[in-house]
Amino acid sequence: MTSSPHDHVLPRRARLAVCLLFGLYGVILGTWTTRIPAIKQDLSLTDGALSLGLLAFAAGAIIGMQAAGRLVDRYGTYRLLLPVALADGLLLVSPALAPNLIVLAGCLLAFGITHGLLNITMNTAAVEVQRAWQAPIMSSFHAVYSVGGFLGAAVGGLCAYAGLSAAATFLTVAAVVAVIAPVAARWRLAPSAVPVAETGAGRGGLPGVTFLGVLVFCCLVGEGAAADWSSVYLHDSLGSTPGFAAAAYAAFSIMMMAGRMVGDRLTATLGPVRLVRYSGVLAALGLGTALLIGHPVAGVAGFGLLGAGLACIAPQVFSTAGGQDPARAGQAIARVASLGFLGFVVGPLAIGALAELIGLPAALTIPAVLALFVAAAATSLRPRAPHPATAAPVTT
């Protein structure tokens, strides 16, 4: 049976739509992180008070992810993508308008919820588009997210340099979201021809999904460690200048983005199991060797290799989790993403606590060891047989 040209038009548009949403997600988060110091200054917050506000954001994200799983499976990504994206852009503005810490915490809780909702909704939509595309394309979506994060950070930095307030910065980004999200929503993939309620799915557990979440947890411990500790390691442990120390996280981010840009081709060539196995080994050897050498240049290279190694792991795990039972993809991805987010938050804290006992260089071996664990457990990404009632293809 041959496909008509029209059969490929909507998947292409749907892929572009999801790419745009991943990009917006990255822009929102990148802009927010660069303007956190302005929020702190405007409200005269101590480090501890700011931490409470950021904890509210993290709690909201977990709540949003958990709620999104069931909402997506019940109502579908088609209905949820646009309102969730618009809400996330709108609530980005709210922290900049908060008059005190209590209101700030409430705003960040709400912002975290919509951010978690958008995370799960767009990742589930990506799995749906990949299923319709019939080829590995998940890494490309995450590459666009990385690009969006860079753009958002650049926008936030330029606005800060120009003396614009955080509120003006966030309003600008919210306006961009309000323009682009409806355009993307017009091209989103149509819902499946088989309604979830008629498939008989949704009963019993999701075999293996929790373990897949553990793999993403391990991966995001490495991402969090690079974000929070790479520059500190180069500056405090290796004695590099602050400017050169910042190159460690820059190398990590650039190599992660580059890895995701070629991730789909690598997936098609190697398959998810071998790709994740080789990726885990690359991440572990790169960081581990750099820690053994103990030189600033080696440190930058090591964190770059860590980024390259971790780049394709999470997209492959999301693809595997979302493909096990398409009718419950939202719940599966929510479980995996929640565990991953927990790793991103808890991992750096654990490394910091351990560094007090054994030193930062030794504590930073944790991400390397976890990357080796992911490599050893890569066989868990072998595809399971789809649920018989949900094996129908996505219609376009």
Task: Give the role of each language-model region.
Residues 141-189:
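Helix-loop-helix hairpin linking two adjacent transmembrane segments in secondary transporters
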